[in-house]
Amino acid sequence: MTDAQVFTILAIALVPAVMAALLGSALARS
């Protein structure tokens, strides 16, 4: 795989995790 492909896969994997963490922290604080 090229560096671009690795970066794309990491971004696709990380974005949902970050969104879930932000949503969870927002719900926990409310």
Curated annotation (Swiss-Prot):
Enumerate the subcellular locations listed in this protein's record, separating them with semicolons. Cellular thylakoid membrane
Q: Which UniProt keywords apply?
A: Membrane, Photosynthesis, Photosystem I, Thylakoid, Transmembrane, Transmembrane helix
Gene Ontology CC entries for this record: photosystem I; plasma membrane-derived thylakoid membrane
- Show the stretches that span the lipid bilayer: 6-26
Q: What is its main location?
A: membrane
Among the GO biological process terms of this entry, one is: photosynthesis
Source domain of life: Bacteria
Signal peptide per UniProt? none
Instruction: List, alphabetically, the Pfam families matched.
Output: PsaM
| Membrane topology designation | Single-pass membrane protein
**InterPro entries the record matches:** PSI_PsaM (IPR010010), PSI_PsaM_sf (IPR037279)
What family name appears in the similarity comment? Belongs to the PsaM family.
Its recorded name reads Photosystem I reaction center subunit XII
Q: Which organism is it from?
A: Synechococcus sp. (strain JA-3-3Ab)
Q: What is the lineage of its organism?
A: Bacteria, Bacillati, Cyanobacteriota, Cyanophyceae, Synechococcales
